[in-house]
Amino acid sequence: LRGELERNDDWGVIRLFPEPSVIPQLTVQLTILASDGRELVVAAVVRAVTGETMGSSVYRDISVNDDYTNDKTDPFADLYVTMVNDIVHAVSSASHQETYLRSLSSLRYASELVPEAFPDYLGQEAGLYSVRREPSREDPMLIRLNRLQDYELLFVDTIDEQLANVSREVSDAYYL
């Protein structure tokens, strides 16, 4: 799925977070329900940092012998294309601006680390978050929290790169 999102080229950086995070403006939570090499069943939930569920589906694909050729194409690539198309549709119908979601993400991150730092800036009603007002870009606390967020992203990127390397190293075993 990640490769297909990157090929789509509409998303910016695609990261794999080891656990739920408020840093990304958009998350896709995947749960593998079945996977035996022939069948893949995946539940996908797309959420904005607002807490809004933008889409939720269960996807199923059954591979055929022709899917396992020597060209190293993932046998479930068509499933990933369908998932990305559904994500694009869900996101394109949403009303949120990217800058708003980025501000909301920053405030939610700040609220998780230091709840008393910006108590009146973030609103929450019925499980949905909103920006009530924004702190100054020169706010010293916000600057420090943004620096921490950058460090966390660097850590996630390092782990992500290591996982990608391991995946490349073992992938040949799947294409015998």
Regions found by a protein language model. Name each.
Residues 1-22, 53, 82, 86, ...:
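N-terminal segment of the mature soluble domain
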Residues 17-32, 103-109:
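Acidic helix-start/capping segments at beta-turn-to-alpha-helix junctions
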Residues 19-25, 35-40, 71-74:
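Generic structural signal for short, solvent-exposed loop/turn connectors between secondary structure elements
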Residues 29-67:
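Amphipathic beta-strand/beta-sheet edge segments enriched in Tyr/Trp
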Residues 63-176:
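C-terminal/domain-edge helix-coil "capping" segments
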